[in-house]
Amino acid sequence: MIPAAVKDALTNNYASYVRPFLWYSGENKELLAREIRAIAASGAKEFVFENRGGDWFGTDFWWDIFGFTLDYAKSLNLRVWSIDDSHVNTGSANDSLHKEENAQYRAVNLRLDMVDAAGPLTGGAFSLPGHTENEKIVQISAFRRDLDSGNSYGEALDLTDCVQDGLLVADIPDGVWRIYYVMTTDPERHGLFGKYITMMSKDSCRHLINETHEKMYEHFADYFGNTFAGFFSDEPAFGNCDGQYGPNAYNLRLGMIDKMFPWWHDFPQRLAEKCNSTPEDVMKKLPALWDSVDEVSASLRLAYMDLVTELWQKNFSEQLGKWCEEHNVEYIGHNLEDADAHMRTGWGCGHYFRSMKGQHMSGMDIVFEQLTPGISTVDHAMNTASRTRSSTFYHYTLPKLAASLAHITPHMKNRALSEIFGATGWTCGLTNMYSLFNHTLICGINNYVPHAYAIPVPQVFESHQDRENAAGSVTPPGYCLTYLPPTFHAGGYNPQYKVFCDIIKYVQRVCHITSTAQHKPDLAVYYCAESDWMNCGSYRSMDDVSMKLIRSGYDFEFLPLETILNEAAAVNGKLAVNNEQYKALILPMSEIIPEALLKKIAEFADSNIKVFFTDALPVRTENGAVDASLLKNIHVLPWATLTTELAAAVSHDFAVAPAQNDLRHYAFTDQNGTDGVMLFNSSLKPIEFTLPGRNHLVYDPWANKLYRLNGNTLQLTAQKIVVVYNDLAQSDLELYPTLPEKYSELDLDYNIFVRSATEKEFKLLRGNSKAVNLNIAEKLTRFCGEFRYESTFECNNANMTTLIIPNAGDAAELFVNGISCGTAFGPYCIFNIKGALKNGINTLQINTFDSPAYADRKGDKNIGWGSGFPLRAHGFTGSIMLG
């Protein structure tokens, strides 16, 4: 029996899972239509219209262009989404907050200044800290300081009413005191975010809807729910930062004295309710958000972050989601997740799960060179201002966050979306695209927004006709027709576009299988945002835990606090949420955890749920020392021995022998109750292992073929995904291809033909030549095109099944005796040539495809971000192997 989803995939009969961005920067309708046709040719069935570089949103020009887009898409049976603001980041409300009439919707933030004083001091005064006319001091408090720890402590003095004539006129008792000045911030301190909406106000978020969503509906109501699919939020933010996207953009936590934090006029009352206190008491203790105040900081910070993330969820995400539902469309998008921004303010969203609760799909992005195949356990350098990034976060944590949110949120229908490729540059060619897709597919991502299609033709390819075709395009003063590589079609000049379209179809096949199935994880892992919020002790990074578990052969999902408290249940010795079940709950070590969490996990442990902390047990909650009786059935997994001790306590549902650190798996049950597992070799070398079970059916989604396994041993080549079903193989299926033990080296001479990206015909570049480095031999360091290698060789064993090009560039397509053997990804291209060889003379044709990386470099219209990946070779070099 072939599973139904696999049957669909074999015939490319799948739903829509890929919706690329279409970057629009003022081009005319003819060029816009050309790019929409290119999207349709890729196999994508929808796209996201992304406004870039123009101030025309909401003008007659915009309505005309977007109306044309909808009509043309409809004629091609495509659906259209739209970014939900005039530009990235979502929240400018079409730049309407620059108008003073909308000033009431602008964000309010607080900052801190302070001075230390040794008392007693009587009859004197203190100068107020410098502040602009747009800043107002809202609270002045003083705390004693502990001269051993440096922390503040004790009862606060409220000095707010002691200001006279620009001075703080107050007596200070005996001891060392720290005087804190809490004030609103000048919007000028926040750069672009100074004129943005605030998630702290329902009315402010509604203003965004009024300026974008309602106006779109007014003009295009007839398209809503059919051709028009919905809205995409792109990196909305709290905005309590300087608005500069630099190396310190994400490092914004409570407990950092120099930072600014969101505020609103009703916060004193709201915080008082959460703290079981009074507004006056909350204001007096407010400096504990910034500085360490014993017995105050943890509880106040927890309450504060609980409040601001709750407001984001209700005011922004759920309000937008509800509006979309009421208008028969859907709401998708993602926030800025990098470097723990997903649980912090500033550029971040404070709480990954809450921030997208109103969306109809979870969201994330992999852009720049954030995820580099082959580098997964150490930080890696990037060609951006932040210089280095955490490989572990992008490989092991971020995609699992997105999949987890989709799986535990019923209205998301298991749909986890990732924007992908943005700003990775032309060096992100076919091989990297294939790998990046696979690294996220294996985590459960099943919807994608590839970034991007862009209409401008790179100048190096641009012809006189292209310039004439661009006539009528419109750009406001100070703007230009720009693009951000990779732009997949590149006006028809990208030699890789044909294979890119094949990749899109491949991704849709894999997404179809996982989208129609129920995930079967081993474990649940606590999403420890609260530990980061309180910032009152050490804790084990979720990234460390993610990497350790995955490389130990476990699959898992993250659960946030409110899910653990309100939705998780003990069912037959397992933890259950929605349709997911987990054999154990793992909590990253934290010195301090929320008291409500401690009580709940103790309840689970008493119900025979296995509950573990990594490293050590917590020592306190926001309310004081831990009640030791609550920990009696909770266990510790020492970090050094976590893998072995966890394996002794919790069995793997799926395990291979020998264990493979680089093998990733995603187990599932399909709609008919058939169990399957998706496997991914995340390394850059082939791996071999023995599968559990027998009579395995293997689906190769790239080749789009079914195989049976010879015994239980499976070989997976580098960066490859297969889907395996136990006990379903049919005897008439071809055996899954394996790598031969021995190879013959073929050091052939080739006729090497070339076609540049701007030419239609191939011409001979080198005759009777070895496969040499063309950058050196032909000085092709500014070239982009296709290469065709033609040769012949003699064979006396037509039963050989494998041809390998060990030193290929981005990708290669192989024909043996005119028979297509498919396309493989570099640099180590492996082809199944079974049945293509014959005894005697054989013909060989190898086609390769450049990305525009060598030719179209930074400058001109190319914004030029993302050049961190290596430029891959033209064609290939050296011998090939036959076995």
Name the predicted role of every residue range:
Residues I2-A4, D8, N12-Y24, N28-R34, ...:
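Carbohydrate-binding surfaces of carbohydrate-active enzymes
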Residues D186-E188, Q730-S731, F849-R857:
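Short acidic/polar inter-strand loop motif in beta-rich domains
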Residues S204-G230:
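An active-site-proximal structural segment forming one wall of the substrate-binding cleft
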Residues I721-V723, T801, N839-D856:
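Short, well-structured beta-strand segments enriched in hydrophobic/aromatic residues
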Residues F793-C795, N799-N817, A824, L844-T848:
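Aromatic-lined ligand-binding clefts that engage carbohydrates, nucleic acids, or primary amines
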Residues E794-C795, C829-I841, P852:
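Short, surface-exposed tryptophan/glycine-enriched loops
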Residues D856-G883:
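Exposed low-complexity, polar/acidic, P/S/T/G-rich flexible segments that act as propeptides
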